[in-house]
From Swiss-Prot:
<protein>
    <recommendedName>
        <fullName>tRNA:m(4)X modification enzyme TRM13</fullName>
        <ecNumber>2.1.1.225</ecNumber>
    </recommendedName>
</protein>
<feature type="zinc finger region" description="CHHC U11-48K-type">
    <location>
        <begin position="15"/>
        <end position="42"/>
    </location>
</feature>
<keyword id="KW-0539">Nucleus</keyword>
<keyword id="KW-0949">S-adenosyl-L-methionine</keyword>
<feature type="binding site">
    <location>
        <position position="24"/>
    </location>
    <ligand>
        <name>Zn(2+)</name>
    </ligand>
</feature>
<keyword id="KW-0863">Zinc-finger</keyword>
<feature type="binding site">
    <location>
        <position position="34"/>
    </location>
    <ligand>
        <name>Zn(2+)</name>
    </ligand>
</feature>
<keyword id="KW-0862">Zinc</keyword>
<dbReference type="InterPro" id="IPR036236">
    <property type="entry name" value="Znf_C2H2_sf"/>
</dbReference>
<feature type="binding site">
    <location>
        <position position="38"/>
    </location>
    <ligand>
        <name>Zn(2+)</name>
    </ligand>
</feature>
<keyword id="KW-0479">Metal-binding</keyword>
<dbReference type="GO" id="GO:0005634">
    <property type="term" value="C:nucleus"/>
</dbReference>
<dbReference type="Pfam" id="PF05206">
    <property type="entry name" value="TRM13"/>
</dbReference>
<comment type="similarity">
    <text>Belongs to the methyltransferase TRM13 family.</text>
</comment>
<dbReference type="InterPro" id="IPR007871">
    <property type="entry name" value="Methyltransferase_TRM13"/>
</dbReference>
<dbReference type="GO" id="GO:0106050">
    <property type="term" value="F:tRNA 2'-O-methyltransferase activity"/>
</dbReference>
<keyword id="KW-0819">tRNA processing</keyword>
Length: 368
């Protein structure tokens, strides 16, 4: 008996975002089938390092989750906030330019592919070397927002010791470097490292588990990240408070993705001291950070565009304001590290020609 082919309506054939992960879509008529098999579907976590929202100090504030945008502000209100952000940023020390290098990246740079990533990694490794990341007979390394863990691969090239790598990322990543870290070590007769990959949101990461697991190893602990997006940086600082590492090196980016709910009590108090006292006011600050990395529209001159923008500012002026807003958030994080007992600094670790997101947070424990 011949099968009857079902005819779907246009609505049933429409592609819709997956409710579990908006990064991919599904045909509407297959939604129920997809939800049962989607890799992003919620699962009951039994990992010993999982504790829901352990690194978030409070629940979501309704005023932050609203659809408020800075376009809702009048020109006068916008001008008031721009004046405040200018005043705050101008009162803060600016980062120093410290573009470093590590020879472990020579071969990678000669490959010629994605060279900008290699330049960033080379400088971050140079900063790690200055903080004695590689001086030990084995260390414990946390890579936050690890992605494919390419940076950890080159940390192993620098250290060449029996290290432990704890690779933390909430997403599944293809072409991971985990196996390459092991293969490189075997090929070069280095001690074989241990690699632990944790697929987890940093907000739920109970770092105490690993601290207790390796407490008797005698190995120093270090943290780093090449691309820690927005709120993930604040969550990482919250996470590290329970078991502070010897040092941390974090390349900062995507400030427009910061969220009030992921800030610590100290960070909120510091912002309030500067005149940014609630989620909506912080939303104005973080949305303006996007101005720093907005590209020029076609046929627009850097000194133009003021008449077509809500702020009445040219593209060039908006970029300057955006950079100042980013600096306020970065400096708040620097102060947070100092509150945790670290010596800390902000540095331009690469030039703007490599990436517009070129500031790194450096922190290391004070020696009494």
């Amino acid at each position: 008996m011949a099968r009857i082919k079902k005819i779907f309506t246009q609505e049933e054939l429409k592609q819709i975002p997956c409710p579990y992960d908006h990064k991919h879509t599904i045909v509407r008529h297959r939604l129920e089938y997809h939800l049962k098999r989607c890799n992003a579907r919620p699962v009951e976590r039994t990992d010993p390092y999982y504790k829901k929202d352990i690194n978030i100090s409070t629940s979501t504030d309704a005023s932050e989750s609203s659809s408020f945008e800075i376009v809702d502000l009048s020109k006068e209100e916008l001008s008031k906030w721009i004046c405040l952000f200018n005043r705050i940023s101008d009162s803060l020390p600016t980062p120093q330019k410290k573009v470093l290098f590590h020879p472990a990246m020579n071969a990678r740079l000669e490959e010629g592919t994605k060279k900008k990533h290699a330049i960033q990694q080379a400088s971050l490794l140079g900063h790690m070397e200055k903080l004695h990341y590689f001086d030990n007979q084995g260390s414990i390394y946390y890579e936050f927002g690890a992605g494919r863990a390419e940076l950890s691969r080159y940390v192993q090239h620098c250290s060449q010791q029996e290290n432990v790598y704890i690779l933390i990322d909430r997403d599944s990543n293809r072409t991971k470097h985990d196996s390459r870290i092991l293969k490189d070590s075997i090929k070069n007769n280095w001690p074989e490292p241990k690699i632990i990959r944790c697929k987890i949101d940093i907000k739920d990461l109970k770092l105490d588990f690993f601290a207790s697991e390796f407490r008797n190893s005698g190995k120093p602990v270090f943290a780093y990240s090449k691309h820690l997006c927005g709120a993930a940086t604040d969550l990482t600082l919250n996470c590290l408070k329970s078991s502070p590492p010897n040092a941390l090196v974090i390349a900062l980016c995507c400030h427009h993705h910061c969220r009030w709910r992921t800030l610590s009590t100290f960070a909120r108090e510091q912002l309030s001291h500067w005149g940014i006292s609630n989620p909506q006011e912080f939303q104005i600050l973080r949305q303006m950070t996007g101005w720093a990395v907005n590209s020029l529209r076609e046929h627009m001159h850097a000194s133009g565009g003021a008449d077509s923008h809500i702020s009445g500012l040219s593209h060039e002026e908006r970029v300057k304001i955006g950079l100042k807003c980013k600096h306020i958030i970065n400096y708040m994080r620097k102060l947070e590290c100092e509150k945790m007992g670290y010596e800390s600094s902000l540095v331009y670790y690469v030039g703007e020609e490599t990436t517009l997101e070129n500031v790194a947070l450096i922190a290391y424990k004070r020696i009494n």
